[in-house]
Regions:
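ATP-binding N-terminal substructure of ATP-dependent carboxylate-amine bond-forming enzymes
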Residues: 1-101, 105, 127
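Hydrophobic anchor at the start of a short beta-strand
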Residues: 30, 117, 174
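Short active-site oxyanion
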Residues: 66-69, 117-119, 152-153
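Glycine-/Pro-rich loop/turn segments that contact NAD(P) or position catalytic residues
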Residues: 98-136
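ATP-grasp fold ATP-binding core
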Residues: 110, 133-157, 172-186, 200-204
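Short beta-strand-to-turn element immediately C-terminal to the catalytic PLP-Schiff-base lysine
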Residues: 123, 154-159, 190-193
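Hydrophobic alpha-helical segments, chiefly the membrane-spanning helices
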Residues: 217-218
Length: 218
Protein backbone atom coordinates (compact mmCIF):
# COMPACT_ATOMS: atom_id res chain seq x y z
CA UNK A 1 0.00 0.00 0.00
CA UNK A 2 3.05 2.25 0.19
CA UNK A 3 2.52 3.25 -3.45
CA UNK A 4 -0.94 4.66 -2.65
CA UNK A 5 -0.94 7.73 -0.45
CA UNK A 6 -4.50 9.04 -0.56
CA UNK A 7 -7.73 7.25 -1.53
CA UNK A 8 -10.57 9.49 -2.67
CA UNK A 9 -14.08 8.17 -2.05
CA UNK A 10 -17.20 9.48 -3.76
CA UNK A 11 -19.91 8.96 -1.16
CA UNK A 12 -19.79 9.23 2.61
CA UNK A 13 -22.34 6.64 3.72
CA UNK A 14 -21.81 3.46 5.71
CA UNK A 15 -20.05 1.73 2.81
CA UNK A 16 -17.66 4.65 2.49
CA UNK A 17 -17.01 4.44 6.21
CA UNK A 18 -16.13 0.75 5.94
CA UNK A 19 -13.78 1.46 3.03
CA UNK A 20 -12.01 4.07 5.15
CA UNK A 21 -11.67 1.70 8.10
CA UNK A 22 -9.86 -0.84 5.93
CA UNK A 23 -7.81 1.81 4.12
CA UNK A 24 -6.49 3.11 7.43
CA UNK A 25 -5.46 -0.42 8.44
CA UNK A 26 -3.36 -0.51 5.26
CA UNK A 27 -1.74 2.82 6.04
CA UNK A 28 -3.56 4.92 3.45
CA UNK A 29 -5.00 8.39 3.91
CA UNK A 30 -8.57 9.08 2.80
CA UNK A 31 -10.58 11.99 1.49
CA UNK A 32 -14.35 11.73 1.11
CA UNK A 33 -16.94 13.66 -0.92
CA UNK A 34 -20.57 13.84 0.22
CA UNK A 35 -23.31 16.50 0.19
CA UNK A 36 -24.25 15.88 3.84
CA UNK A 37 -22.11 17.63 6.44
CA UNK A 38 -22.88 14.83 8.92
CA UNK A 39 -22.11 11.96 6.53
CA UNK A 40 -21.02 8.85 8.51
CA UNK A 41 -17.69 8.52 6.69
CA UNK A 42 -16.70 12.08 7.64
CA UNK A 43 -16.29 10.89 11.23
CA UNK A 44 -13.10 9.02 10.38
CA UNK A 45 -11.91 10.34 7.00
CA UNK A 46 -8.66 12.30 7.03
CA UNK A 47 -10.14 15.00 4.80
CA UNK A 48 -13.60 15.90 3.59
CA UNK A 49 -15.26 17.75 0.75
CA UNK A 50 -18.88 18.77 1.29
CA UNK A 51 -20.37 18.90 -2.18
CA UNK A 52 -22.97 17.38 -4.47
CA UNK A 53 -22.22 14.23 -6.44
CA UNK A 54 -23.25 16.04 -9.62
CA UNK A 55 -20.94 19.01 -9.00
CA UNK A 56 -18.09 18.77 -11.56
CA UNK A 57 -15.89 21.14 -9.53
CA UNK A 58 -16.25 19.07 -6.35
CA UNK A 59 -15.50 15.83 -8.21
CA UNK A 60 -12.49 17.42 -9.88
CA UNK A 61 -11.17 18.63 -6.53
CA UNK A 62 -11.53 15.15 -5.03
CA UNK A 63 -9.67 13.57 -7.94
CA UNK A 64 -6.94 16.21 -7.89
CA UNK A 65 -6.25 15.63 -4.19
CA UNK A 66 -6.26 11.82 -4.45
CA UNK A 67 -3.84 9.21 -5.76
CA UNK A 68 -6.67 6.81 -6.57
CA UNK A 69 -10.44 7.38 -6.60
CA UNK A 70 -13.35 5.01 -6.04
CA UNK A 71 -17.08 5.31 -5.39
CA UNK A 72 -19.04 3.70 -2.58
CA UNK A 73 -22.35 3.17 -4.38
CA UNK A 74 -23.91 3.36 -7.82
CA UNK A 75 -25.98 6.55 -7.59
CA UNK A 76 -23.22 8.83 -8.82
CA UNK A 77 -23.71 10.60 -12.19
CA UNK A 78 -21.59 8.32 -14.34
CA UNK A 79 -21.36 10.75 -17.24
CA UNK A 80 -19.26 13.08 -15.10
CA UNK A 81 -16.63 10.37 -14.63
CA UNK A 82 -16.06 9.84 -18.35
CA UNK A 83 -13.78 12.85 -18.70
CA UNK A 84 -12.28 12.50 -15.21
CA UNK A 85 -11.09 8.93 -15.76
CA UNK A 86 -9.01 10.17 -18.69
CA UNK A 87 -7.09 12.50 -16.35
CA UNK A 88 -7.14 10.74 -12.99
CA UNK A 89 -6.63 7.29 -11.48
CA UNK A 90 -10.22 5.99 -11.21
CA UNK A 91 -9.56 2.24 -11.18
CA UNK A 92 -13.17 1.06 -11.54
CA UNK A 93 -13.79 3.52 -14.32
CA UNK A 94 -17.08 4.61 -15.79
CA UNK A 95 -18.47 1.38 -17.23
CA UNK A 96 -19.33 -0.60 -14.04
CA UNK A 97 -21.05 2.48 -12.65
CA UNK A 98 -22.97 3.05 -15.89
CA UNK A 99 -24.21 -0.56 -16.05
CA UNK A 100 -25.19 -0.80 -12.39
CA UNK A 101 -27.33 2.36 -12.52
CA UNK A 102 -30.02 0.74 -14.69
CA UNK A 103 -31.43 -2.69 -13.89
CA UNK A 104 -32.33 -3.38 -17.52
CA UNK A 105 -28.85 -2.46 -18.71
CA UNK A 106 -27.29 -4.45 -15.86
CA UNK A 107 -29.21 -7.64 -16.64
CA UNK A 108 -28.72 -7.29 -20.39
CA UNK A 109 -24.98 -6.93 -19.83
CA UNK A 110 -24.96 -10.03 -17.62
CA UNK A 111 -26.73 -12.03 -20.33
CA UNK A 112 -24.27 -10.76 -22.94
CA UNK A 113 -21.47 -12.23 -20.82
CA UNK A 114 -23.13 -15.63 -20.51
CA UNK A 115 -24.53 -15.28 -17.01
CA UNK A 116 -27.87 -16.80 -16.10
CA UNK A 117 -30.57 -14.35 -14.98
CA UNK A 118 -34.32 -14.54 -14.32
CA UNK A 119 -36.49 -13.81 -17.36
CA UNK A 120 -37.02 -10.05 -17.70
CA UNK A 121 -38.64 -7.45 -19.94
CA UNK A 122 -38.63 -3.67 -20.11
CA UNK A 123 -41.87 -2.01 -18.96
CA UNK A 124 -42.66 1.60 -19.82
CA UNK A 125 -46.44 1.75 -19.36
CA UNK A 126 -49.46 -0.35 -18.42
CA UNK A 127 -49.76 -1.87 -21.89
CA UNK A 128 -46.18 -3.12 -21.88
CA UNK A 129 -46.69 -4.37 -18.32
CA UNK A 130 -49.53 -6.64 -19.47
CA UNK A 131 -47.41 -7.90 -22.37
CA UNK A 132 -44.54 -8.69 -20.02
CA UNK A 133 -46.82 -10.50 -17.55
CA UNK A 134 -48.28 -12.56 -20.41
CA UNK A 135 -44.78 -13.69 -21.32
CA UNK A 136 -43.21 -14.10 -17.88
CA UNK A 137 -46.28 -15.08 -15.86
CA UNK A 138 -47.08 -14.83 -12.17
CA UNK A 139 -45.47 -14.52 -9.70
CA UNK A 140 -43.16 -11.78 -10.92
CA UNK A 141 -41.49 -8.65 -9.60
CA UNK A 142 -41.86 -5.14 -11.02
CA UNK A 143 -38.91 -2.88 -10.26
CA UNK A 144 -37.99 0.66 -11.17
CA UNK A 145 -34.98 0.61 -13.46
CA UNK A 146 -33.08 3.25 -11.51
CA UNK A 147 -32.59 4.46 -7.93
CA UNK A 148 -34.08 1.39 -6.28
CA UNK A 149 -32.36 -0.23 -3.30
CA UNK A 150 -33.14 -2.51 -0.34
CA UNK A 151 -36.62 -3.32 -1.61
CA UNK A 152 -37.57 0.26 -2.48
CA UNK A 153 -39.17 0.75 -5.88
CA UNK A 154 -40.35 -2.86 -6.12
CA UNK A 155 -43.67 -4.70 -6.13
CA UNK A 156 -44.19 -8.46 -6.05
CA UNK A 157 -47.10 -9.39 -8.31
CA UNK A 158 -48.79 -12.70 -7.54
CA UNK A 159 -51.98 -12.08 -9.49
CA UNK A 160 -54.25 -9.45 -11.02
CA UNK A 161 -55.18 -8.19 -7.57
CA UNK A 162 -51.65 -6.80 -7.24
CA UNK A 163 -51.79 -4.69 -10.41
CA UNK A 164 -52.96 -1.63 -8.49
CA UNK A 165 -49.68 -1.39 -6.57
CA UNK A 166 -47.79 -1.98 -9.81
CA UNK A 167 -49.36 1.11 -11.37
CA UNK A 168 -47.80 3.26 -8.66
CA UNK A 169 -44.35 2.46 -10.07
CA UNK A 170 -45.16 3.08 -13.73
CA UNK A 171 -44.46 6.81 -13.55
CA UNK A 172 -40.84 5.89 -14.33
CA UNK A 173 -39.26 3.23 -16.59
CA UNK A 174 -39.44 -0.23 -15.02
CA UNK A 175 -38.34 -3.81 -15.54
CA UNK A 176 -40.46 -6.91 -14.91
CA UNK A 177 -38.58 -9.96 -13.68
CA UNK A 178 -39.48 -13.58 -13.12
CA UNK A 179 -39.85 -14.30 -9.40
CA UNK A 180 -37.07 -16.55 -8.16
CA UNK A 181 -37.71 -18.56 -4.97
CA UNK A 182 -34.69 -18.30 -2.70
CA UNK A 183 -33.52 -19.54 0.69
CA UNK A 184 -31.01 -16.80 1.41
CA UNK A 185 -29.15 -13.91 -0.19
CA UNK A 186 -25.35 -14.04 -0.37
CA UNK A 187 -22.86 -11.24 -0.91
CA UNK A 188 -19.70 -12.00 -2.85
CA UNK A 189 -16.73 -9.66 -2.48
CA UNK A 190 -14.20 -9.51 -5.32
CA UNK A 191 -10.96 -7.58 -5.64
CA UNK A 192 -8.71 -7.03 -8.63
CA UNK A 193 -5.24 -5.60 -9.19
CA UNK A 194 -5.95 -5.06 -12.87
CA UNK A 195 -4.69 -8.49 -13.88
CA UNK A 196 -6.05 -10.95 -11.32
CA UNK A 197 -9.52 -11.23 -9.81
CA UNK A 198 -9.82 -12.80 -6.36
CA UNK A 199 -12.93 -13.42 -4.28
CA UNK A 200 -13.49 -14.56 -0.74
CA UNK A 201 -15.06 -18.03 -0.35
CA UNK A 202 -18.85 -17.94 -0.21
CA UNK A 203 -20.11 -19.43 3.05
CA UNK A 204 -23.27 -19.74 5.09
CA UNK A 205 -22.72 -19.46 8.84
CA UNK A 206 -25.02 -21.08 11.38
CA UNK A 207 -24.63 -20.36 15.10
CA UNK A 208 -26.46 -22.70 17.45
CA UNK A 209 -27.46 -22.04 20.10
CA UNK A 210 -27.70 -18.36 19.23
CA UNK A 211 -25.44 -16.20 21.43
CA UNK A 212 -27.16 -13.94 23.92
CA UNK A 213 -25.85 -10.85 25.62
CA UNK A 214 -25.12 -11.53 29.30
CA UNK A 215 -27.44 -8.72 30.37
CA UNK A 216 -30.30 -10.43 28.52
CA UNK A 217 -29.45 -13.80 30.06
CA UNK A 218 -29.58 -12.28 33.54
Amino acid sequence: MSAVKTIGIIGGGQLGLMIIEQAHLLGARTICLDPAEDAPAFKISDERIVGRFDDPAALEELCRRSDVVTYEFENVPGNLLVALEQKYNIKQGFRPLFDSQDRLREKSNACDHGLKTPAFMAVDDEESLHRAIARIGYPCVLKTRTLGYDGHGQAVLRGEADLAKARELLAVPCILEEFVPFDFEASVVLVSDGERVICFPVCLLYTSPSPRDRSVSR
